[in-house]
C-alpha cells in the first residue's frame, strides 16, 4: 500500500475553483468518510487551507484509489470529474511524501516561507486522528512532515524572506495609502488569522481597530488584547459591518465563511458620505472570498485578494533561502523513505528469525528424545551452542538485507529473502500486524 495525494491549489486552479472546493471541518469529515467506504482506501485525511484542498490516502491500487477520491471531491464541489481533473494534481508514493514535506515547510504556499500552513497541517492530522481515519502510515508521514517543517523554519532564513500573507497584503495597502500609522482598520474574523492581522496592524502603527466577528464575545476578546497594547479598539457583530466600514482606511478579512460576509449593500451603506478622496483598501484573505467581487468596482475602493498577493515579489522567498529549504526537504524525504523501506523488510527478517528459532527448538526436542541420559547442565550448554551458531549465521545477512533494503529500489530484497528461505507470507504479515513477537538476535559477546 502507498500514499496517494489528490489536490487542487492556487498553483493549479483559479480562486473561483478553489471557492467551489472550500471545506469546513464538517465537510472534511464527510469527504474522508466517503473515501474510506471504498475497500481500496485504508487511511485518509484532508488538508484544507485558503489556498489548497488536498486528500492524502493510503490505497491498495493507484488507479482505483484515484477514481474514488476524484469522484468524492467532484461530488463535493458540484463539478464533473472531467472538469475537476483539469485543475487537479496527483502525487503517488515518494512524490506524495515530497509534496507534503514541501507544503509543511512553506515551499508550496502563495507566500513562500509562511508559517501558518504548518499549523494547518497539524490541525488536518489532529482532526483525522480524532476521527480514527489515520493509521500507522499517515501518522508517521504527518509527524515527519511537521518535524521537517519546523526544521526548515529554524535552520533557514525562509521565515524572514517569505513574509506572511497578512504582511504582504499590508505592504500592498501601504503602497496605495501611504503609512498606516494613525489610521483606522477593520478586522473581520477573530480567529487565528484575525489575531495575526491585528498583530501586524499594531506593528504598522494603526490607531484604531474595529473587530467584527460572528461571535461578539470572541470579537471582544481580540479587541481587549488590542486595548491592552494601547490601541483603540471596539467589537461588533457581522450586522455592523457597514458601520465599521464608515471610517475605515484598511480592512482585513479572513473568516472561512462559505459565502461573502461583506456585501455590495454593506459597502454602499458604509461608504455613503465619505469624502471622495478618501480611499479604502480591502484585503480579502478568505477562501472562499469574503468580499463580493462587485465591491472592487466601487470608486475609491481597492480589493486585494489572494491572486493579487501571489503576484507580489515580496511573496517569494530569497532564492538562497528557498534553495536551502529545498535541500533540507530533499534530505528528509530520502531519510524518511529509507526508514520506510527498512521498516518494510523488518517483518520478513523477524519471520526468518522466528522460523530459525522454531527449527532450533524442534532439533533440541529431537536431541532430548535421542539422548535422554543428558543431564540438565549439558542439555543447556548444547542448546546455548546451537542458538549461538544460528544467531551468528543469521546476523550478517539480516543486517545486510536491511541496509540494502533502505536504498531506492530495495523492496526486492524482502521478496528475495522470502523466496530463499521459503517464508510463508502469512507469517510475515502476522509479524507486521504485531501478532508475532519481535525476536532480537542475541550474540554471546564472550565468544
From Swiss-Prot:
Pathway: Porphyrin-containing compound metabolism; protoporphyrin-IX biosynthesis; 5-aminolevulinate from L-glutamyl-tRNA(Glu): step 1/2
Keywords: NADP, Oxidoreductase, Porphyrin biosynthesis
Pfam entry (one): Shikimate_DH
GO aspect biological process, one term: protoporphyrinogen IX biosynthetic process from glutamate
Catalysed reactions, as listed in the record: (S)-4-amino-5-oxopentanoate + tRNA(Glu) + NADP(+) = L-glutamyl-tRNA(Glu) + NADPH + H(+)
Keyword NADP found: yes
Catalytic residues, chain numbering: 50
Residue positions binding substrate: 49-52, 109, 114-116, 120
E.C. number: 1.2.1.70
Job description of the protein: Catalyzes the NADPH-dependent reduction of glutamyl-tRNA(Glu) to glutamate 1-semialdehyde (GSA).
Family indicated by similarity: Belongs to the glutamyl-tRNA reductase family.
HAMAP family: Glu_tRNA_reductase (MF_00087)
Subunit composition and interactions: Homodimer.
Protein name per the record: Glutamyl-tRNA reductase
Amino acid at each position: 500500500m502507498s500514499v496517494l495525494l489528490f489536490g487542487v491549489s492556487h498553483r493549479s486552479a483559479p480562486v473561483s475553483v478553489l471557492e467551489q472546493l472550500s471545506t469546513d471541518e464538517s465537510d472534511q469529515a464527510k469527504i474522508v468518510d466517503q473515501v474510506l467506504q471504498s475497500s481500496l482506501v485504508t487511511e485518509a485525511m484532508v488538508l484544507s487551507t485558503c489556498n489548497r484542498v488536498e486528500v492524502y490516502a493510503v490505497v491498495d491500487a493507484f488507479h482505483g484509489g484515484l477514481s474514488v477520491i476524484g469522484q468524492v471531491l467532484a461530488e463535493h464541489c458540484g463539478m464533473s470529474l472531467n472538469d475537476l481533473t483539469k485543475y487537479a494534481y496527483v502525487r503517488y508514493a515518494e512524490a506524495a511524501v515530497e509534496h507534503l514535506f514541501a507544503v509543511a515547510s512553506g515551499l508550496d504556499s502563495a507566500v513562500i516561507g509562511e508559517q501558518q500552513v504548518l499549523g494547518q497541517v497539524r490541525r488536518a492530522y489532529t482532526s483525522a486522528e480524532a476521527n480514527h481515519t489515520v493509521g500507522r502510515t499517515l501518522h508517521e508521514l504527518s509527524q515527519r512532515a511537521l518535524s521537517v517543517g519546523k526544521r526548515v523554519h529554524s535552520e533557514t532564513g525562509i521565515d524572514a524572506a517569505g513574509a506572511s500573507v497578512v504582511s504582504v497584503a499590508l505592504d500592498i495597502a501601504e503602497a496605495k495609502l501611504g503609512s498606516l500609522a494613525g489610521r483606522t482598520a477593520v478586522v473581520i474574523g477573530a480567529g487565528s488569522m484575525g489575531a495575526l492581522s491585528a498583530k501586524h496592524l499594531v506593528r504598522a502603527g494603526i490607531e484604531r481597530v474595529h473587530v467584527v466577528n460572528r461571535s461578539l464575545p470572541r470579537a471582544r476578546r481580540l479587541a481587549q488584547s488590542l486595548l491592552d497594547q494601547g490601541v483603540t479598539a471596539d467589537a461588533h457583530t457581522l450586522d455592523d459591518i457597514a458601520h465599521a466600514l464608515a471610517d475605515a482606511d484598511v480592512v482585513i478579512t479572513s473568516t472561512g465563511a462559505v459565502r461573502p460576509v461583506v456585501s455590495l449593500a454593506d459597502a454602499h451603506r458604509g461608504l455613503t458620505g465619505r469624502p471622495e478622496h478618501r480611499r479604502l483598501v480591502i484585503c480579502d484573505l478568505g477562501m472562499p472570498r469574503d468580499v463580493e467581487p462587485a465591491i472592487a468596482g466601487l470608486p475609491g475602493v481597492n480589493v486585494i485578494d489572494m491572486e493579487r498577493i501571489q503576484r507580489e515579489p515580496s511573496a517569494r522567498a530569497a532564492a538562497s533561502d528557498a534553495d536551502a529549504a529545498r535541500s533540507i526537504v530533499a534530505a528528509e524525504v530520502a531519510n524518511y523513505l529509507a526508514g520506510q523501506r527498512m521498516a518494510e523488510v523488518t517483518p520478513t527478517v523477524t519471520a526468518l528469525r522466528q522460523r530459525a528459532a522454531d527449527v532450533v527448538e524442534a532439533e533440541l526436542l529431537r536431541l532430548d528424545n535421542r539422548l535422554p541420559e543428558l543431564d540438565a547442565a549439558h542439555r543447556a550448554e548444547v542448546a546455548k551452542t546451537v542458538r549461538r551458531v544460528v544467531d551468528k549465521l543469521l546476523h550478517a545477512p539480516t543486517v545486510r538485507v536491511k541496509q540494502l533494503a533502505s536504498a531506492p529500489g530495495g523492496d526486492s530484497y524482502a521478496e528475495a529473502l522470502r523466496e530463499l528461505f521459503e517464508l510463508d507470507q502469512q507469517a510475515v504479515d502476522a509479524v507486521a500486524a504485531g501478532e508475532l513477537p519481535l525476536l532480537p538476535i542475541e550474540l554471546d559477546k564472550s565468544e
